[in-house]
Amino acid sequence: MVRNKINNNINIITNNDDNLSIPRVLPSNIQAEQMLLGAIITNNELLSYVSEFLRNEHFFEPIHQKIYDAIEKIIEKGLIATPITLRSMLTQDALFQEIEGVEYLAKLITMSMMVINPIDYGKIIYDLAIKRNLINIGEEVVNNAYNASLAVAAKEQIEHAEAKLYDLAREGLNEKSFTQVGISIAESLASINKAMKNNDHVIGISTGLLDLDNKLFGFHNSDLIILAGRPSMGKTAFAINLALNTCNNMRLKNIRDNQEIKSVGFFSLEMSSEQLTTRLLSLCAEIDSTSLRTGMLSEEKYNRLRKEANTLSELQFFIDDTPALSISAIRTRARRMKRKHNLGILFIDYLQLIRGVSKSENRVNEISEITQGLKAIAKELNIPVIALSQLSRAVELREDKKPMLSDLRESGTIEQDADIVMFIYREEYYLTRKEPAAGDAKHAEWLDKLNKVYNIADIIIAKHRNGPVGNISLYYDSQFSKFGNLEKRTFNSILNT
C-alpha cells in the first residue's frame, strides 16, 4: 500500500521524427532515497557525511524531501532523529498522513539494513537531481525561445541559458568545508617562498609602475580593485595603461615559466572598441589621437604606427564594448573568456554603467548587487578585477579637490566590497583653469605651482585590505594619455618594459 502512494513524475517529450508524444519518466532512484533515509534514521551520524552536498530539494519524492528536512531540523536542535521524533514533527503533514507515515518510516529502516556505503547513495541522489535540473533548464530555454517578445534579443536569451548551465555545473563545487590549519600554512609558506625568490617582491601581476608595485605588490587574484576619479582626471587612460602593462607582463612571465599565456579582458561600456584601440595605438606609437583620427600622419609616424599595431595585434588583449551590460551578463562573458582564453585579469569601464539583475528603484541597493557580483567574479575565476568608478560632484564644491572615500557614488557598498580603492587626481587640471591674468602679481606664484605638478598624476590609495595606504605620483603625458614612473629616465615604452 505504501509503495503505491509514491508518485512518478512524467514529462511528455515530442519525437521530432514522427511528432508522437512519448512519456518519459524524470531520472530518479526512489530506492536509493529510501535506503539513505533509513540509514540516517538508524545512525544519525551519517547525516554529517552527506549534508555537505545533499539538500532536501535533491530528493525526487516530496515525502522524502519532507523526511530529510525533518531529520536535519531535529538533529540541529540537539535531538535524535528517530521514528518517534519524526512522527511528532510530521504528524500534521497531509502527505505524511496519506502514505501512512509511521508504517513508511518502519519500511525505510528495514530497507537500510542492506546499505553498505550510504555516501554512495547520497551521490546517486545528488547526480540525478542535477540531471532533472538540466531537463528543467532545457525546457525553460525552449519555452522562452517560443514566448519571447521582440524586445528580448536572442543573444540575451543565450547568455541567460549559458549562465543557468554554468551555475548548475558548479553547484556543489563551491561548498567548501573546514581546512586543517596545516594545509593553509603549507600554502602560505609556498607563497612566502615564492615572494622571497622574487627580487622585486611583486607577488601579484606587475602594473609596470615601480612606485605602484611597491605599494600594492602587484594586482592579486580574487581582489576587487576600484579605480575612481572625476571626469578628465584620466581614469580610463590609466586603466588602458594598466591593462597593457599587465598583459605584457603576464605574457613574459608565462613564457618564462612555460605556462599557458593569460589574457586581459576589458569591458568598455562607454567607449567603442575602435575608440579604445585608437587610444592604445596613440599610447604605444606616441602619436596624438587627433592625428590618428584625421589621418594627418607623416610617413615616419605611419611606419611607427604600423610597427606598434603589429605588436599590439599579437597580445592576448580582448575588448567587449557592448553597452549597458548586466552584472549577470558580465559574469557569463568573463566565465566564457576564462574557459576559452585563460583570462588572467579583468577591467571594467565603468561601474555605474552596469545594470543590476533585480529591478531595484534604490540605486544604492543596485550598486551593492553589482559590487558584490564583481567581487564574486574575482573570487570564482581567481583573477583581479579592476572596476572604474565615478565620484560624486561634491568634490567640485570643496576647495581641496583631492578625493576621499566618502566621494564615491553610492560609496558605502563600493568601499565595503572592494579590497583596494584607488583615486586618480591631477592638480594640474584644476590649476590650468585658475590662471590669473598675465600681468597679475599672483601669476608668477601660479606658474610656480603649475610647474611643480606639470605632467604629474597622483594615485591615492585610500583603502588596501592587505597592505599600506598612501599616495604615489606618476608621470602623465596627456598628449598620448601615457603613464609612467615619475623619473623620466625610468619611463620607457609600455611594450618594452
Swiss-Prot record:
Query: Quick one: which residues bind ATP?
Result: 229-236
Please list the GO terms describing molecular function.
Answer: ATP binding; ATP hydrolysis activity; DNA binding; DNA helicase activity
Catalysed reactions listed for this entry: Couples ATP hydrolysis with the unwinding of duplex DNA at the replication fork by translocating in the 5'-3' direction. This creates two antiparallel DNA single strands (ssDNA). The leading ssDNA polymer is the template for DNA polymerase III holoenzyme which synthesizes a continuous strand; ATP + H2O = ADP + phosphate + H(+)
Among Gene3D superfamilies, the record links this protein to:
DNAb Helicase, Chain A, P-loop containing nucleotide triphosphate hydrolases
Q: What class of enzyme is it?
A: isomerase
| Pfam entry (one) | DnaB_C
Q: Which domain of life is it from?
A: Bacteria
Q: Name one GO biological process term.
A: DNA replication, synthesis of primer
Q: What is its EC number?
A: 5.6.2.3
A single GO CC term, please?
cytosol
Q: Which family does it belong to?
A: Belongs to the helicase family. DnaB subfamily.
Explain the purpose of this protein. Answer: The main replicative DNA helicase, it participates in initiation and elongation during chromosome replication. Travels ahead of the DNA replisome, separating dsDNA into templates for DNA synthesis. A processive ATP-dependent 5'-3' DNA helicase it has DNA-dependent ATPase activity.
Tell me the protein's name.
Replicative DNA helicase DnaB
Source organism of the structure: Rickettsia typhi (strain ATCC VR-144 / Wilmington)
